[in-house]
Protein backbone atom coordinates (compact mmCIF):
# COMPACT_ATOMS: atom_id res chain seq x y z
CA UNK A 1 0.00 0.00 0.00
CA UNK A 2 1.35 3.41 -1.00
CA UNK A 3 0.66 5.98 1.72
CA UNK A 4 -0.94 9.25 0.58
CA UNK A 5 1.49 11.32 2.67
CA UNK A 6 5.16 11.66 3.56
CA UNK A 7 6.74 12.28 6.96
CA UNK A 8 7.78 15.74 5.78
CA UNK A 9 4.16 16.55 4.95
CA UNK A 10 3.14 15.45 8.44
CA UNK A 11 5.83 17.71 9.95
CA UNK A 12 4.60 20.61 7.81
CA UNK A 13 0.96 20.02 8.74
CA UNK A 14 1.82 19.74 12.45
CA UNK A 15 3.84 22.99 12.34
CA UNK A 16 1.01 24.89 10.61
CA UNK A 17 -1.52 23.56 13.12
CA UNK A 18 0.75 24.62 16.00
CA UNK A 19 1.71 28.06 14.68
CA UNK A 20 -1.60 28.80 12.92
CA UNK A 21 0.49 30.51 10.26
CA UNK A 22 2.07 29.35 7.00
CA UNK A 23 4.77 32.01 7.34
CA UNK A 24 5.83 31.03 10.86
CA UNK A 25 5.66 27.31 10.06
CA UNK A 26 7.91 27.89 7.03
CA UNK A 27 10.43 29.75 9.20
CA UNK A 28 10.51 26.99 11.82
CA UNK A 29 11.01 24.27 9.20
CA UNK A 30 13.47 26.33 7.12
CA UNK A 31 11.46 25.93 3.92
CA UNK A 32 9.96 28.54 1.62
CA UNK A 33 6.30 29.44 2.07
CA UNK A 34 5.38 28.55 -1.55
CA UNK A 35 6.96 25.10 -1.09
CA UNK A 36 5.09 24.61 2.20
CA UNK A 37 1.77 25.64 0.62
CA UNK A 38 2.36 23.27 -2.29
CA UNK A 39 3.02 20.36 0.10
CA UNK A 40 -0.22 21.00 1.99
CA UNK A 41 -2.20 21.26 -1.26
CA UNK A 42 -0.68 17.96 -2.44
CA UNK A 43 -1.47 16.35 0.92
CA UNK A 44 -5.11 17.46 0.83
CA UNK A 45 -5.49 16.32 -2.79
CA UNK A 46 -4.06 12.88 -2.02
CA UNK A 47 -6.24 12.48 1.06
CA UNK A 48 -9.24 13.81 -0.83
CA UNK A 49 -10.35 16.03 2.03
CA UNK A 50 -9.77 19.57 3.28
CA UNK A 51 -7.57 19.77 6.40
CA UNK A 52 -7.28 23.54 6.84
CA UNK A 53 -9.70 26.42 6.54
CA UNK A 54 -8.02 29.61 5.38
CA UNK A 55 -10.11 32.66 6.30
CA UNK A 56 -8.15 35.86 5.74
CA UNK A 57 -5.13 35.67 8.03
CA UNK A 58 -6.71 32.95 10.16
CA UNK A 59 -5.93 29.26 9.73
CA UNK A 60 -8.25 26.80 11.43
CA UNK A 61 -8.32 23.01 11.37
CA UNK A 62 -11.33 21.37 9.82
CA UNK A 63 -12.94 18.42 11.58
CA UNK A 64 -10.82 16.14 9.38
CA UNK A 65 -7.78 18.26 10.21
CA UNK A 66 -8.28 17.76 13.95
CA UNK A 67 -8.44 13.97 13.50
CA UNK A 68 -5.48 13.91 11.11
CA UNK A 69 -3.38 16.03 13.49
CA UNK A 70 -3.83 13.47 16.29
CA UNK A 71 -2.56 10.68 14.04
CA UNK A 72 0.23 12.86 12.62
CA UNK A 73 1.55 13.58 16.12
CA UNK A 74 1.46 9.89 17.01
CA UNK A 75 3.21 8.82 13.80
CA UNK A 76 5.96 11.43 14.18
CA UNK A 77 6.44 10.56 17.86
CA UNK A 78 6.77 6.86 16.99
CA UNK A 79 9.34 7.67 14.30
CA UNK A 80 11.41 9.66 16.80
CA UNK A 81 11.02 6.91 19.37
CA UNK A 82 12.22 4.23 16.94
CA UNK A 83 15.33 6.31 16.21
CA UNK A 84 16.00 6.73 19.93
CA UNK A 85 15.58 2.99 20.50
CA UNK A 86 18.14 2.18 17.79
CA UNK A 87 20.53 4.87 19.00
CA UNK A 88 20.19 3.47 22.49
CA UNK A 89 21.42 0.10 21.23
CA UNK A 90 24.35 1.74 19.47
CA UNK A 91 25.39 4.29 22.05
CA UNK A 92 25.18 2.41 25.35
CA UNK A 93 25.15 5.03 28.11
CA UNK A 94 24.87 7.93 25.69
CA UNK A 95 21.54 9.25 24.50
CA UNK A 96 18.82 11.88 24.67
CA UNK A 97 15.94 12.24 27.09
CA UNK A 98 12.93 14.55 26.97
CA UNK A 99 11.85 15.51 30.48
CA UNK A 100 8.77 17.51 31.43
CA UNK A 101 7.75 19.33 34.60
CA UNK A 102 4.82 21.42 35.73
CA UNK A 103 5.66 25.04 36.41
CA UNK A 104 6.55 25.21 40.11
CA UNK A 105 8.43 21.91 39.94
CA UNK A 106 10.25 23.02 36.81
CA UNK A 107 11.35 26.27 38.40
CA UNK A 108 12.45 25.03 41.83
CA UNK A 109 12.73 21.25 42.18
CA UNK A 110 13.82 20.11 38.73
CA UNK A 111 17.00 22.26 38.48
CA UNK A 112 18.45 20.42 41.49
CA UNK A 113 17.50 17.03 40.05
CA UNK A 114 18.98 17.90 36.66
CA UNK A 115 22.21 19.22 38.14
CA UNK A 116 22.82 16.01 40.10
CA UNK A 117 21.84 13.85 37.13
CA UNK A 118 24.17 15.75 34.78
CA UNK A 119 27.04 15.18 37.20
CA UNK A 120 26.40 11.42 37.18
CA UNK A 121 25.59 11.12 33.46
CA UNK A 122 27.25 14.01 31.57
CA UNK A 123 27.01 12.10 28.29
CA UNK A 124 23.18 12.12 28.27
CA UNK A 125 21.52 15.13 26.66
CA UNK A 126 18.43 16.35 28.49
CA UNK A 127 15.69 18.39 26.83
CA UNK A 128 13.46 20.11 29.39
CA UNK A 129 9.86 21.23 28.84
CA UNK A 130 8.08 23.26 31.55
CA UNK A 131 4.36 23.92 31.24
CA UNK A 132 1.02 23.33 32.95
CA UNK A 133 0.27 19.84 34.27
CA UNK A 134 -2.41 19.38 31.60
CA UNK A 135 -0.08 20.18 28.70
CA UNK A 136 2.83 18.17 30.12
CA UNK A 137 0.58 15.14 30.69
CA UNK A 138 -0.69 15.37 27.11
CA UNK A 139 2.88 15.45 25.79
CA UNK A 140 3.79 12.34 27.78
CA UNK A 141 0.63 10.62 26.52
CA UNK A 142 1.44 11.40 22.88
CA UNK A 143 5.12 10.46 23.42
CA UNK A 144 6.51 13.96 22.86
CA UNK A 145 8.07 13.61 26.34
CA UNK A 146 9.66 10.52 27.88
CA UNK A 147 8.98 11.26 31.56
CA UNK A 148 7.67 14.11 33.69
CA UNK A 149 7.15 15.23 37.27
CA UNK A 150 3.93 17.16 37.89
CA UNK A 151 2.03 18.58 40.82
CA UNK A 152 -1.44 19.30 39.51
CA UNK A 153 -4.45 17.13 38.74
CA UNK A 154 -4.00 15.08 35.58
CA UNK A 155 -7.02 15.27 33.24
CA UNK A 156 -9.17 12.15 33.54
CA UNK A 157 -9.15 11.58 29.79
CA UNK A 158 -5.36 11.21 29.77
CA UNK A 159 -4.99 8.92 32.78
CA UNK A 160 -5.78 5.75 30.81
CA UNK A 161 -2.73 6.41 28.60
CA UNK A 162 -0.33 7.12 31.45
CA UNK A 163 1.45 5.39 34.28
CA UNK A 164 1.17 7.65 37.33
CA UNK A 165 3.29 7.08 40.44
CA UNK A 166 3.23 9.03 43.69
CA UNK A 167 6.64 10.63 44.11
CA UNK A 168 7.12 13.09 46.98
CA UNK A 169 4.97 15.21 49.23
CA UNK A 170 5.05 18.96 48.63
CA UNK A 171 3.90 21.20 51.47
CA UNK A 172 2.22 24.49 50.59
CA UNK A 173 3.07 26.96 53.30
CA UNK A 174 1.97 30.42 54.34
CA UNK A 175 4.66 33.10 54.29
CA UNK A 176 4.76 36.69 55.57
CA UNK A 177 7.47 39.32 55.85
CA UNK A 178 9.80 39.41 58.86
CA UNK A 179 8.25 42.72 59.88
CA UNK A 180 4.65 41.47 59.92
CA UNK A 181 3.02 41.50 63.40
CA UNK A 182 2.14 37.79 63.05
CA UNK A 183 5.85 37.01 62.70
CA UNK A 184 6.18 37.85 66.39
CA UNK A 185 3.50 35.37 67.45
CA UNK A 186 4.51 32.56 69.76
CA UNK A 187 5.51 29.45 67.79
CA UNK A 188 4.68 31.36 64.58
CA UNK A 189 1.15 29.94 64.67
CA UNK A 190 -2.15 31.64 63.82
CA UNK A 191 -5.81 30.66 64.07
CA UNK A 192 -8.24 30.22 61.20
CA UNK A 193 -9.85 33.53 62.14
CA UNK A 194 -6.51 35.31 61.77
CA UNK A 195 -6.53 34.48 58.05
CA UNK A 196 -9.34 36.99 57.49
CA UNK A 197 -7.07 39.78 58.77
CA UNK A 198 -4.31 39.13 56.24
CA UNK A 199 -3.78 40.83 52.91
CA UNK A 200 -3.24 38.02 50.40
CA UNK A 201 -1.07 37.93 47.32
CA UNK A 202 -2.06 34.98 45.15
CA UNK A 203 -1.35 33.28 41.88
CA UNK A 204 -3.90 33.71 39.12
CA UNK A 205 -7.23 32.18 40.18
CA UNK A 206 -7.04 29.73 37.27
CA UNK A 207 -3.72 28.26 38.43
CA UNK A 208 -3.65 24.66 39.66
CA UNK A 209 -2.00 25.54 42.98
CA UNK A 210 -4.48 28.35 43.68
CA UNK A 211 -7.44 26.02 43.13
CA UNK A 212 -5.87 23.25 45.22
CA UNK A 213 -5.19 25.55 48.20
CA UNK A 214 -8.68 27.03 47.95
CA UNK A 215 -10.30 23.59 48.02
CA UNK A 216 -8.31 22.46 51.07
CA UNK A 217 -9.15 25.63 53.01
CA UNK A 218 -12.84 25.37 52.12
CA UNK A 219 -12.83 21.73 53.30
CA UNK A 220 -11.58 23.10 56.63
CA UNK A 221 -14.54 25.50 56.87
CA UNK A 222 -12.53 28.55 55.87
CA UNK A 223 -14.42 30.99 53.65
CA UNK A 224 -11.75 31.93 51.12
CA UNK A 225 -14.24 34.20 49.33
CA UNK A 226 -13.93 36.50 52.37
CA UNK A 227 -10.13 36.77 52.07
CA UNK A 228 -8.72 40.20 51.33
CA UNK A 229 -6.85 39.48 48.09
CA UNK A 230 -4.94 42.65 47.22
CA UNK A 231 -2.94 41.31 44.32
CA UNK A 232 -2.96 38.47 41.77
CA UNK A 233 0.37 37.71 40.11
CA UNK A 234 1.42 35.10 37.56
CA UNK A 235 4.94 34.62 38.93
CA UNK A 236 6.01 32.92 42.15
CA UNK A 237 9.18 35.02 42.15
CA UNK A 238 7.07 38.19 42.04
CA UNK A 239 4.88 36.88 44.86
CA UNK A 240 7.90 36.15 47.07
CA UNK A 241 9.32 39.61 46.42
CA UNK A 242 6.00 41.26 47.26
CA UNK A 243 5.76 39.29 50.51
CA UNK A 244 9.34 40.12 51.52
CA UNK A 245 8.54 43.81 50.98
CA UNK A 246 5.66 43.55 53.45
CA UNK A 247 2.84 43.89 50.93
CA UNK A 248 0.97 40.81 52.10
CA UNK A 249 0.93 37.07 52.80
CA UNK A 250 0.99 34.18 50.34
CA UNK A 251 0.81 30.42 50.07
CA UNK A 252 3.78 28.95 48.19
CA UNK A 253 5.43 25.58 47.71
CA UNK A 254 8.05 24.80 50.36
CA UNK A 255 10.49 24.00 47.53
CA UNK A 256 10.20 27.59 46.29
CA UNK A 257 11.45 29.46 49.36
CA UNK A 258 14.73 27.84 50.38
CA UNK A 259 16.71 30.89 49.30
CA UNK A 260 14.38 33.32 51.09
CA UNK A 261 14.56 31.32 54.32
CA UNK A 262 18.34 31.25 54.11
CA UNK A 263 18.44 35.02 53.56
CA UNK A 264 15.75 35.49 56.25
CA UNK A 265 13.59 37.71 54.06
CA UNK A 266 10.33 35.88 54.85
CA UNK A 267 8.82 34.01 57.78
CA UNK A 268 6.75 30.82 57.72
CA UNK A 269 3.61 30.77 59.83
CA UNK A 270 1.42 27.74 60.46
CA UNK A 271 -2.35 27.58 60.79
CA UNK A 272 -3.82 25.75 63.78
CA UNK A 273 -4.85 22.20 62.86
CA UNK A 274 -4.30 22.74 59.13
CA UNK A 275 -1.49 21.41 56.99
CA UNK A 276 -1.72 21.76 53.21
CA UNK A 277 0.17 19.16 51.20
CA UNK A 278 -0.06 17.74 47.71
CA UNK A 279 1.56 14.69 46.17
CA UNK A 280 3.89 15.20 43.23
CA UNK A 281 3.68 12.48 40.60
CA UNK A 282 6.03 10.87 38.11
CA UNK A 283 4.20 10.23 34.85
CA UNK A 284 5.31 8.03 31.97
CA UNK A 285 3.75 6.36 28.96
CA UNK A 286 3.70 2.57 29.51
CA UNK A 287 3.69 1.98 25.73
CA UNK A 288 6.82 4.05 25.05
CA UNK A 289 10.28 2.60 24.54
CA UNK A 290 12.31 2.96 27.74
CA UNK A 291 15.88 3.72 26.82
CA UNK A 292 18.92 3.33 29.04
CA UNK A 293 18.87 7.11 29.46
CA UNK A 294 15.27 6.80 30.69
CA UNK A 295 16.22 4.05 33.17
CA UNK A 296 19.15 6.10 34.51
CA UNK A 297 16.97 9.19 35.02
CA UNK A 298 14.05 7.25 36.48
CA UNK A 299 16.29 5.46 38.98
CA UNK A 300 18.05 8.72 39.86
CA UNK A 301 14.71 10.34 40.72
CA UNK A 302 13.94 7.63 43.27
CA UNK A 303 17.46 7.78 44.70
CA UNK A 304 17.13 11.54 45.17
CA UNK A 305 13.78 11.08 46.90
CA UNK A 306 15.41 8.90 49.53
CA UNK A 307 18.34 11.25 50.22
Curated annotation (Swiss-Prot):
Gene that this sequence comes from: rbcR-A
Function: Trans-acting transcriptional regulator of RuBisCO genes (rbcL and rbcS) expression.
Subcellular localization(s) per the UniProt record: Plastid, Chloroplast
Keywords from the UniProt entry: Chloroplast, DNA-binding, Plastid, Transcription, Transcription regulation
Gene3D superfamilies in alphabetical order: 3.40.190.290, Winged helix-like DNA-binding domain superfamily/Winged helix DNA-binding domain
A GO MF term: DNA-binding transcription factor activity
Swiss-Prot/TrEMBL GO biological process terms: regulation of DNA-templated transcription
Residues of the HTH lysR-type domain: 5-62
InterPro entries, sorted: LysR_subst-bd, Tscrpt_reg_HTH_LysR, WH-like_DNA-bd_sf, WH_DNA-bd_sf
SUPFAM superfamilies tied to this protein: Periplasmic binding protein-like II, Winged helix' DNA-binding domain
The entry's DNA-binding region: 22-41
Main location: plastid
Protein name (record): Probable RuBisCO transcriptional regulator
Gene source species: Thalassiosira pseudonana (Marine diatom)
Cellular component GO terms, alphabetical: chloroplast
Family: Belongs to the LysR transcriptional regulatory family.
Amino acid sequence: MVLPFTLQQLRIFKAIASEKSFTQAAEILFVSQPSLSKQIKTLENRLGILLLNRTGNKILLTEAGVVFLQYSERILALCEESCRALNDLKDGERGNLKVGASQTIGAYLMPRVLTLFAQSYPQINLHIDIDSTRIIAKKVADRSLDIAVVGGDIPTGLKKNLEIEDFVEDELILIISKSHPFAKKKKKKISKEDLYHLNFITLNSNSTIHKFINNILIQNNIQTAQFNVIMELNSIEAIKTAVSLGLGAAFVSSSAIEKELELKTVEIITIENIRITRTLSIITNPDSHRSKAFDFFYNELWLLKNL
